[in-house]
Amino acid sequence: MSHSVKIYDTCIGCTQCVRACPTDVLEMIPWDGCKAKQIASAPRTEDCVGCKRCESACPTDFLSVRVSLWHETTRSMGLGY
């Protein structure tokens, strides 16, 4: 089951989230918005298992990577039973 994976512009390009992901959902892409000149990207969200290891690995104060599990998303939209 895929989950929503959002990357925010607070990403510092450290690659911690990419290395933490057991299913290779994340990768780094070029970006001029930070010192590292790269930012995390999530091109394979269909492979996300929702473990949130990427969130745990993120060293920024405001998590740059956020995973929304399917059941959390439907509940927040009032679609859960």
Swiss-Prot record:
Record's keyword annotation contains Iron-sulfur: yes
The protein's required cofactors: [4Fe-4S] cluster
Membrane topology, as annotated: Peripheral membrane protein
Binding residues annotated for [4Fe-4S] cluster 2, in chain numbering: C21, C48, C51, C54
Principal cellular location given in the protein's record: plastid
Annotated Pfam families: Fer4_21 (PF14697)
Binding-site list for [4Fe-4S] cluster 1: C11, C14, C17, C58
Note describing how the cofactor binds: Binds 2 [4Fe-4S] clusters. Cluster 2 is most probably the spectroscopically characterized electron acceptor FA and cluster 1 is most probably FB.
EC number: 1.97.1.12
GO MF term list: 4 iron, 4 sulfur cluster binding; electron transfer activity; metal ion binding; oxidoreductase activity
Classification via InterPro entries: 4Fe4S_Fe-S-bd, 4Fe4S_Fe_S_CS, PSI_iron-sulfur_center, PSI_PsaC
Membrane recorded as keyword: yes
GO CC annotation, single: photosystem I
Domain of life: Eukaryota
Boundaries of every 4Fe-4S ferredoxin-type domain copy: 2-31, 39-68
Catalytic activity: reduced [plastocyanin] + hnu + oxidized [2Fe-2S]-[ferredoxin] = oxidized [plastocyanin] + reduced [2Fe-2S]-[ferredoxin]
A single BP term in Gene Ontology: photosynthetic electron transport in photosystem I
Stated role: Apoprotein for the two 4Fe-4S centers FA and FB of photosystem I (PSI); essential for photochemical activity. FB is the terminal electron acceptor of PSI, donating electrons to ferredoxin. The C-terminus interacts with PsaA/B/D and helps assemble the protein into the PSI complex. Required for binding of PsaD and PsaE to PSI. PSI is a plastocyanin-ferredoxin oxidoreductase, converting photonic excitation into a charge separation, which transfers an electron from the donor P700 chlorophyll pair to the spectroscopically characterized acceptors A0, A1, FX, FA and FB in turn.
Entries under HAMAP family matching the protein: PSI_PsaC (MF_01303)
The protein, known as: Photosystem I iron-sulfur center
